[in-house]
């Protein structure tokens, strides 16, 4: 699948993020309709019971929400997570997981987004909603 992004600099910045490279998250889409990430769960991503660690899932949910927001925000703005709620609905078994994010509200100072993670069979593994603070980055 080809990557689509409103601003290629957003994609480049996220692909260079140390955490995302470390865990192997790959951005496939970031545009006005939201974001799409993939990760292949390997033994290095699992907890004691052999399924994806909740921290990996939360990192994926957080990234999906933030990138969906960044794709709709001006290039000279960033966002930071203020709060996030996650629900885990099924185990994230080894294999490919897909995370998607969408903007619910883009306010002047705060923004709200949601995200979901699904397994290879389309089963919902985790869902979240988060509030993010918008700020000027000074990079523009």
Task: List the predicted regions and their residue ranges.
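Terminal targeting signals and extreme-terminal segments of soluble enzymes
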Residues: 1-140
């Amino acid at each position: 699948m080809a990557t689509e992004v409103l601003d290629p600099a957003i994609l480049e910045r996220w692909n260079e993020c140390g955490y995302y490279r470390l865990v192997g998250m790959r951005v496939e889409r970031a545009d006005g309709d939201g974001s799409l990430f993939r990760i292949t769960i390997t033994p290095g991503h699992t907890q004691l019971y052999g399924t994806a660690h909740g921290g990996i899932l939360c990192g994926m949910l957080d990234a999906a929400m933030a990138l969906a927001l960044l794709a709709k925000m001006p290039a000279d703005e960033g966002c930071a997570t203020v709060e996030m709620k996650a629900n885990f609905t099924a185990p994230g078994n080894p294999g490919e997981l897909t995370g998607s994010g969408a903007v619910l509200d883009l306010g002047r100072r705060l923004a709200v987004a949601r995200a979901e993670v699904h397994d290879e069979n389309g089963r919902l593994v985790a869902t979240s909603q988060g509030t993010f603070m918008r700020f000027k980055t000074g990079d523009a």
